[in-house]
C-alpha cells in the first residue's frame, strides 16, 4: 500500500455513524438510570501489577524538573473510579480510551474504548441483570443465560475445575496441544482449557454470564462467603467474544495490598517488570469504599456484534495499522 492510500479510515463512514448512535444510546441508558458520567486520567503515576496486562509508558518532562517522570497509560479507569466512589460519588459510569501493550488482530487493538460502571449497594447478580438489560437494548438479543464457571467447565472440559488434581489438568492440556503443559501452574492450565474448550462453545445463540470464577482468579473481586473456592466475579460471552468482566468489588485494603504484592512476586518469577503499588488507590480503600459491584465492557467488541463486523478495524475510525 502506498503512502497516499494510508490516509483512509479503517471503518466505513456508515459504520462510524452507527457507532455514534450506539454510544449515544449507551449514555442515555445510564443517565436515565441516574448514574453520573465521569472522566478520569488516561495517564497515571502507577502501572498495574496484573501479570496478564502489559502497559505503555511515556516520559513527562518539564524545564522545571530535574529529571523526567515515568507515567503509564491506563489499562482501565478502575482505580481512579474507585477513588471517586470512596469520595462519595455514588453510582458512576465512564466511556474512555484505554491502552494495552499486547496483540492486535480481529478482536484486539492496543488502544480501545472501554465502558466501565460501578453500582454501590448492588450485588454481583443484580449487576449481571443490568449488563443483560444493556445487551438486549444494544444488540436486540435474547435475555442472557446464567451459569457458574464450574458448571460450564465440567460440561465442556469434563473436569471439575475446583477440585481436580493438577495432573488431570496437565493431561487434558496436552490433549489440546499445549506445549510444556507440565511446567504451567494451575491457573494457567485452567485459563488455557477455558479459552480452548469452553469459550468457543458458549453464548452462541444468546449471551451467557459465567459467574463464580476460581478464587485464584479473583483479581479485584471479593471471595464468596458461601464457597471460599470461588470469587464473586463474572464474565459475559456472546458469539465467541468476551464482552465484559465484573466483580463484587474487594473493599479490604490489606487484602488488596497482599494481592498486589503476590502479583509482583509472580512478575519477578516470570521475568516481567515489577510495578510500584498504587498507594493512592489503597488509601481510598482504607478511607472506605462502599460495598459495590462494578463491570468493564469492551465497547468496540459490542459494536462489532451490533453491526455484524468480523474485525475490530471495521468499527474504529483508525486501527493501529493506520493510526
Swiss-Prot record:
It comes from the Bacteria. ATP binds at residues 100-102, 109, 242-243, 298. With EpmB is involved in the beta-lysylation step of the post-translational modification of translation elongation factor P (EF-P). Catalyzes the ATP-dependent activation of (R)-beta-lysine produced by EpmB, forming a lysyl-adenylate, from which the beta-lysyl moiety is then transferred to the epsilon-amino group of a conserved specific lysine residue in EF-P. PROSITE patterns: AA_TRNA_LIGASE_II. It catalyses: D-beta-lysine + L-lysyl-[protein] + ATP = N(6)-((3R)-3,6-diaminohexanoyl)-L-lysyl-[protein] + AMP + diphosphate + H(+). This is Elongation factor P--(R)-beta-lysine ligase. It comes from Histophilus somni (strain 2336). Its EC number is 6.3.2.-. Belongs to the class-II aminoacyl-tRNA synthetase family. EpmA subfamily.
